[in-house]
Amino acid sequence: YLSIKSGNSKNAVCSGSERVSTWMKSEKCDSEVENLKELDEQPIIAFKKDFLRWMLSDGAAAFLLQDTPNKEGLSLKIEWMESYSYAHELETCMYAGGDKLADGEIKPWSDYSSEDWLKESVFSLKQDVKILNDNILIKGVESMKSAMDKHQLSSDNIDYLLPHVSSNYFVQGLFDEFSKKGIHVPLEKWF
C-alpha cells in the first residue's frame, strides 16, 4: 500500500493468513492436562486455553492493489487506514512461550526448567480473559471513535460495518458501547 501511495510501485499484492488450528487441537494439550492436578481447583487454567480453541480460527485473504481503478468491474478505494495499540496501557492479554504471573508480568519459557515446560503449560497459547472482557469493547470503540473523528466520518456515512469480533457473544455489547459514544450503525448494516 505505502509503495503504491509513494509512487514507487503501480501494483502490489497484500496478503495475510493465520493458521492457529495446529496449536489448538485437543491432543496438543493432553499431556499438559494430565500434569495439571490442580485443574479441578483452578478451572480458569483450562478456560484460558479452551476459550481460544473456540474463538480463533484459520483464515486467509489477499488483495491486488493498484494505482488506478479497475477498468472493468468493481474497484474499492482506500481513503485511509488507522491502527491502534494499547500495549502501553494494558497488561499482556494473549501470550505463548511463557506464563503470566499474578502481578501481570510474563515469565518467559527460558526461566522455567525443562521439566516444568509441560507441567506449567508454558508453550500453550493463552489469553487473559479478564483483561479481554474488561477492555475489548471499550478499547475497540475508543479506536473507532478516534479514527472517525480524525477523518471526519459520521455514522451516516457507513453503509456496511465489518467488526472484528470472534463471536456473536460480543456483538450486542459492541453495539451498545458504540451507541454510548455516539456511533449509531444499525445492526442490519453489520456483517
Placement of each model-derived feature along the sequence:
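Claisen-condensing/thiolase-fold acyl-transfer catalytic domains that form or cleave C-C bonds
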Residues: 1-5, 129-149, 154-155, 159-191
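Condensing-enzyme catalytic core mediating Claisen C-C bond formation in acyl metabolism
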Residues: 41-138, 142
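A glycine- and small-aliphatic-rich helix-loop capping segment at beta-alpha/alpha-beta transitions
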Residues: 2-7, 27-40, 177-183
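Extended hydrophobic secondary-structure segments that form protein cores and membrane-embedded regions
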Residues: 13-15, 81, 160-164
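Short acidic, glycine/serine/threonine-rich loops at helix termini
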Residues: 23-29, 90-92
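Acidic, glycine-rich active-site loops and adjacent beta-strand->loop/helix elements
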Residues: 16-21, 84-86
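Active-site-proximal alpha-helical scaffold in enzymes
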Residues: 1-18, 63-69
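Short, active-site-adjacent cap segments at secondary-structure transitions
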Residues: 20-22, 168-169
